[in-house]
Amino acid sequence: MLIPSKLSRPVRLDHTVVRERLLAKLSGANNFRLALITSPAGYGKTTLISQWAAGKNDIGWYSLDEGDNQQERFASYLIAAVQQATNGHCAICETMAQKRQYASLTSLFAQLFIELAEWHSPLYLVIDDYHLITNPVIHESMRFFIRHQPENLTLVVLSRNLPQLGIANLRVRDQLLEIGSQQLAFTHQEAKQFFDCRLSSPIEAAESSRICDDVSGWATALQLIALSARQNTHSAHKSARRLAGINASHLSDYLVDEVLDNVDLATRHFLLKSAILRSMNDALITRVTGEENGQMRLEEIERQGLFLQRMDDTGEWFCYHPLFGNFLRQRCQWELAAELPEIHRAAAESWMAQGFPSEAIHHALAAGDALMLRDILLNHAWSLFNHSELSLLEESLKALPWDSLLENPQLVLLQAWLMQSQHRYGEVNTLLARAEHEIKDIREDTMHAEFNALRAQVAINDGNPDEAERLAKLALEELPPGWFYSRIVATSVLGEVLHCKGELTRSLALMQQTEQMARQHDVWHYALWSLIQQSEILFAQGFLQTAWETQEKAFQLINEQHLEQLPMHEFLVRIRAQLLWAWARLDEAEASARSGIEVLSSYQPQQQLQCLAMLIQCSLARGDLDNARSQLNRLENLLGNGKYHSDWISNANKVRVIYWQMTGDKAAAANWLRHTAKPEFANNHFLQGQWRNIARAQILLGEFEPAEIVLEELNENARSLRLMSDLNRNLLLLNQLYWQAGRKSDAQRVLLDALKLANRTGFISHFVIEGEAMAQQLRQLIQLNTLPELEQHRAQRILREINQHHRHKFAHFDENFVERLLNHPEVPELIRTSPLTQREWQVLGLIYSGYSNEQIAGELEVAATTIKTHIRNLYQKLGVAHRQAAVQHAQKLLKMMGYGV
């Protein structure tokens, strides 16, 4: 829950001086990106902006405290303030902030600006007490905010110092409205107005001016002088002389003498006790001070001018002026030291009663009450964990003695999940092992089962599927049906283990079960994970269309639950890119890979390795080797500076080896082959992929026999495990092996198998990257006119893709080629005496490449009837009667010119 008072603009008080000259300057705030109000404490920053904000509707107010250095807390309140200003316009951002479903503050702000693009009225966001922010991540995020905020939004920041928000740049670009302490200082006229409304007996203008000069227009000093004068301790001028030259850090003695010592003991204790509250209402005051009618007491303190201010229009919430509040808290530690723990306990109990466990934890920590802290955590820790209050939980658990954790194993489990969320896998197992060894009376087997579910998740994350399987099975055997979270975890882990072992059908069933349970209990990140795993399994089985449909369900879940900022979103767009690439939808595949990189923009560059490999695959499929080389340099740098799962390494190696094949770089392939890992098994798609990389390198080096052994074993495993997509890839590589080894009939046999299997997988680009060797074989198959209709159509489509992206390898009938051909001593006399036109040579090249008449017309952007005329003319000039004869004639010409076809 968010504390309402932190989102309420302070109420404009009746006896404050209206700062007309400053309000006039602020009237043009909408022309600036940032309005910055800076001064030491007590110069009236908040009062001024509350006056300016009066009557404005499109304004959000966020009052900071020290706890707002937690990024998640800062995000929640800031988005809530924007929602307040826009009447709930940014619903997606609000949900993302509430559920902590964003990768970083900057990515959350980017989504906010997308939603605000539809908001066209002027909009203001006030952030008060920004000097309390010390978290550099928040500073950087707010710099991003200011750089990219909509033109109709003005950010108003109040701070005691110059914040780290890129102020100099804004000032140069005239996008900054500044008001500092010199402008905030009261003028003689304002000081006179102030005393006139505060004192029963007015003072002369000259006296008022001297007092104002003595304290340099400091508003807090003027307020203290008025308070002293009302209490008749001594003259206003005497107070002014005493305050002259005193700054906020030296006020303690003065405040003791002039404020605390001039109120009765009951009021003194009320002030000291209530000051421990960062914000307060009737219930909190009654519980903390022990006085009845807390609201009336607060209003009485307000009337006495004791630096208390209302925080909302209803008058329910109050807080002390920061300067006075800090002073009172220090005095409370000195004067009520013995009572202070009990006061904090009372505050914690009252916050709990009002449903604010995070505030209660703050006071339980201050009280040093481990038992109270334990009880709060037992009741609310998992809710705080699910809302990503990780820093607060970690601080709280550290404050508990180890014996208290042992007596409450749920808290040990919580601490372990905190470690797991921070990828401290080794510490998780150490903590759980120590706890199980020392816990004397653990409840039945349930807690052991929860420990094992977490251990299983750690094991699979750490690349140990056998241990993960053992632990997940133990957990599922012992967990009661109602312990849904750990059951979801264990079921998901077991499904992932089976996926790794190639038991795809069983894995798919478990992932579907995980999805169902996760949806039932609103555990959305596991629901998304299970859908991604289902898609990968279906892809491996060769059911790419069903994999696509499963991905669509995952995208829908992301949109419905606003999960766009989760790192898992990158996983989804990456496997979508892989599927699009397989279907030769290269522009869409590249766009998906780039969106994956964008999702991970706030993470370490190593996390982008997989998407970068996908971009390289797109370049390779297009035949764009220059771009591929540039991207490979970055990929190889990332490989050398990180530790990766075998799946990641396999995908990175794949694009490297294909690039070496396309460029004929045998030295690089040989060096890689000497050092690369050779997996013990090949029972899943990433192990199959690594062995396929090895076989491709061996083929490039002419090591046909060991490559054939590898590929035959891969095919045997793929067939037995129904890894149909891997089988399709293996057949294509085996085809290249046979072709280069001169075993043409074997090459044709496996190519026919690959084409048939592609009717299921839909593969196109896997054929295309094999380039000219593949094109030659497909042309021959098309010429034989024996392919079934589906295979014939696919072969023609593959040839079109090769022609589009690799034309330099085989479309040889350009002007230079024709000139050399006509000057060749062995050129047929018929061609020499009746030469083809340049257009007819182009048509012959496209016929040779396997294009139909309609496709040739589309390629050359002419009418189909025009193409028929060109074909009729070139047939006559070549002395051929049909297409197959024209292809054979073109083949003879290419051989004569030294092209291997």
From Swiss-Prot:
InterPro entries reported for this sequence: P-loop_NTPase (IPR027417), Sig_transdc_resp-reg_C-effctor (IPR016032), TPR-like_helical_dom_sf (IPR011990), TPR_MalT (IPR041617), Tscrpt_reg_HTH_MalT (IPR023768), Tscrpt_reg_LuxR_C (IPR000792), WH-like_DNA-bd_sf (IPR036388)
Mechanisms controlling activity: Activated by ATP and maltotriose, which are both required for DNA binding.
Key words of the record: Activator, ATP-binding, Carbohydrate metabolism, DNA-binding, Nucleotide-binding, Transcription, Transcription regulation
Example GO biological process: positive regulation of carbohydrate metabolic process
Residue ranges for the DNA-binding region feature of this UniProt entry: 853-872
Domain HTH luxR-type: start-end pairs: 829-894
GO MF terms held by the record: ATP binding; DNA binding; DNA-binding transcription factor activity
Binding site for ATP: 39-46
PANTHER family attached to this UniProt entry: DNA-BINDING TRANSCRIPTIONAL ACTIVATOR DEVR_DOSR
Subunit architecture: Monomer in solution. Oligomerizes to an active state in the presence of the positive effectors ATP and maltotriose.
Family: Belongs to the MalT family.
NCBIfam families: PRK04841.1 (NF003420)
Free-text function comment from the UniProt entry: Positively regulates the transcription of the maltose regulon whose gene products are responsible for uptake and catabolism of malto-oligosaccharides. Specifically binds to the promoter region of its target genes, recognizing a short DNA motif called the MalT box.
Name the UniProt record assigns to this protein: HTH-type transcriptional regulator MalT
Lineage: Bacteria, Pseudomonadati, Pseudomonadota, Gammaproteobacteria, Enterobacterales
